[in-house]
Amino acid sequence: MPWGQRTYIMGIINATPDSFSGDGLAVGADWVETAVRQAQQFAADGADILDIGGESTRPGSQPITAEEELARVLPVITAVRQSVNLPISIDTYRANVAEAALQAGASWVNDVWGLRMDGRMADVVAKAGCPIVIMHNRSKPKNVAQEEKLGGRYVGMEYGDLIGDIKRELQESIDLALAAGVDASQIILDPGVGFGKTVEQNRQLI
């Protein structure tokens, strides 16, 4: 894709039963077909990229194993790849899941932990020569608050300088990618709105 020429639209396909946005598809016997229909609708609506994830990042969600994640995402990637001609992003922080997803037809990796959770992830991305979305994330899975209007949310972390700290920590993730041999032109940065930040901090980022 020619980066920088325009804004690209990503359609999110949650192959989970417990999505943050309430649209998890991994329920019922025909959930793979449901995911394909959603992908087709995204394509018809003008999406440029499809992002497929198998582990919920919603506040209070329970972690799953790599085997469970693979069982959710691989059938969807395979089926979507056969029916929709759009690049597929695999939303995972696990190197072995990313590797299998890329082999199944994904085009890039979206890591919500910015290469910090799995030491092999940067190497997998470098070997594949694919784009990598590096997200800033200080959230702690069990550090969750419930609010009447907002529902569950991650509790904001302490920042000495919100923008400066995020830039510094993203640079650390960039350095991990570059050290592994990832091409700088393939790195996409995500400031992590909603992850380990208060509502006010999220507004400041936006």
Q: Locations of the language-model features?
A:
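Conserved beta-strand positions in the central sheet of alpha/beta enzyme cores
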Residues: 48-51, 89, 110-111, 133-134, ...
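Conserved anion-binding
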Residues: 15-22, 57-58, 104, 115-197
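Catalytic domains of carbohydrate-active enzymes, especially glycoside hydrolases
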Residues: 37-53
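Short beta-strand/loop segments at the ligand-binding rim of alpha/beta enzyme cores
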Residues: 7-9, 83-91, 108, 184, ...
